[in-house]
């Protein structure tokens, strides 16, 4: 399977699990052995790349501000570009600017993705059953990009991905191993 083939599957799943007026959001960043693969929950309509009229990349967090604080804080993002993001409204993001942002993500050897690619209109909870439907596809995505480390965000994503109940507040900085297609990945 290729990333492009996964994208076609994600689009089909959007029709089943996501808002029918929005498009699925794929992933973005370094696709060849990134240092860190960040796995978030699922996109919302706040991501302007979910708009059917958007012609740019369909990557996580396009048109948003807060998540970029994290990448700046860990020294994995250009300060000038970070300040430019902070000063822009969502409507100020162009396809060219989104590409510039994700070129910087890739330069810093990061890969950003969501467990569920089904874009919802808002941040309403998504069931474990829906996330589980995406799990084998995320595993294929991870096997293709082959990250050095996986960082999971939130109790639900961590629990579904690791196959056990996880309370992030109780296991901060704890390493979990996850084997995908015969290779073991450290997860935090």
Where are these regions (language model features)?
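A polyanion-binding, active-site-adjacent surface
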Residues: 2-149, 153-171, 183-186
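Short glycine-rich, acidic/polar surface loops and turns
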Residues: 171-179
């Amino acid at each position: 399977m290729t990333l492009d083939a996964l994208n076609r599957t994600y689009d089909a799943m959007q029709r089943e699990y996501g808002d029918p007026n929005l498009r699925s959001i794929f992933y973005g960043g370094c696709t060849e052995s990134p240092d860190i693969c960040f796995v978030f929950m699922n996109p919302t309509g706040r991501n302007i790349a979910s708009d059917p009229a958007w012609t740019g990349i369909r990557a996580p967090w396009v048109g948003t501000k807060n998540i970029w604080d994290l990448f700046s804080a860990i020294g994995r993002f250009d300060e000038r570009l970070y300040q430019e993001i902070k000063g822009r409204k969502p409507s100020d993001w162009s396809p060219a600017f989104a590409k510039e942002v994700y070129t910087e993500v890739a330069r810093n050897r990061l890969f950003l993705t969501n467990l569920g690619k089904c874009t919802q209109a808002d941040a309403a909870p998504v069931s474990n059953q829906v996330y589980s439907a995406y799990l084998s596809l995320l595993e294929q995505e991870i096997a293709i990009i082959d990250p050095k480390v996986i960082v999971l965000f939130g109790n639900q994503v961590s629990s579904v991905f690791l196959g056990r109940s996880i309370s992030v507040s109780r296991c901060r900085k704890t390493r979990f191993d996850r084997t995908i297609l015969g290779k073991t990945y450290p997860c935090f």
